[in-house]
């Protein structure tokens, strides 16, 4: 029999704590994040990360070990087909705990535990296309490394994107042209005769 954790247990008995953590883990994998008390979130974190590690392995034994805890077949399927492969290259730290304000009724400290989202392939492609096009994120962060290579490939594949970027730069007036226009406007106002 495993040694129970020291200190107060969630729910009172070890069996209730085990079921409580199983239900919290199921809800976490089903919804991607849940709001609960800080104590429950801290106890759930290693429990859920262990299940994600089993899902990364992906073999039959790992699936059976997860099925002991998570009784919902659709959640187990999601865990092994989507969540596990998403974190294949990540060595740990699959969840994040964000502290929230106290609960209204009893002022219990609340927290949100959620799965750390990695950028999907589609999101990565969109951000690289925006950097290559010169919009949104281009001013904040210039492409580096593999991103720069992908942006160059995108420019080579799509000459229209490069042409659009060149036209946009050509259409933008320079600071000197704007200053000259302003000076001409003020001179025109000064030379008008008063009636």
Swiss-Prot record:
One of its GO terms (molecular function) is structural constituent of ribosome. It comes from the Bacteria. Residues 159-186 have a biased composition (Low complexity). GO terms for biological process: translation. The keyword Manganese does not apply. Keywords: Ribonucleoprotein, Ribosomal protein. Pfam families: Ribosomal_L17. Residues 132-195 are annotated as: Disordered. GO terms for cellular component: cytosolic large ribosomal subunit. Gene3D superfamilies: Ribosomal protein L17. Belongs to the bacterial ribosomal protein bL17 family. Part of the 50S ribosomal subunit. Contacts protein L32. PANTHER family: LARGE RIBOSOMAL SUBUNIT PROTEIN BL17M, RIBOSOMAL PROTEIN L17. NCBIfam families: L17. This is Large ribosomal subunit protein bL17. It comes from Parafrankia sp. (strain EAN1pec). The lineage of its organism: Bacteria, Bacillati, Actinomycetota, Actinomycetes, Frankiales.
């Amino acid at each position: 029999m495993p040694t129970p954790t020291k200190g107060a247990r969630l729910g009172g008995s070890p069996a209730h704590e085990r079921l409580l953590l199983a239900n919290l883990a199921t809800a976490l994998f089903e919804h991607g994040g849940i709001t609960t008390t800080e104590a429950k979130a801290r106890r759930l974190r290693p429990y859920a990360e262990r299940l994600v590690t089993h899902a990364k392995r992906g073999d039959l034994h790992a699936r059976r070990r997860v099925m002991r805890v998570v009784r919902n077949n659709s959640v187990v399927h999601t865990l092994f087909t989507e969540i596990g492969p998403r974190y294949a290259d990540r060595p740990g730290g699959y969840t994040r705990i964000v502290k929230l304000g106290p609960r209204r009724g009893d002022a219990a400290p609340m927290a949100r535990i959620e799965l750390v989202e990695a950028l999907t392939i589609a999101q990565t492609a969109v951000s690289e296309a925006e950097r290559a096009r010169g919009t949104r994120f281009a001013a904040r962060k210039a492409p580096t490394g593999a991103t720069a290579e992908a942006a160059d490939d995108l420019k080579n594949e799509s000459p229209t994107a490069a042409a659009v970027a060149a036209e946009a730069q050509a259409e933008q007036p320079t600071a000197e042209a704007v200053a000259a226009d302003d000076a001409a406007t003020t001179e025109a106002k000064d030379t008008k005769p008063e009636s």
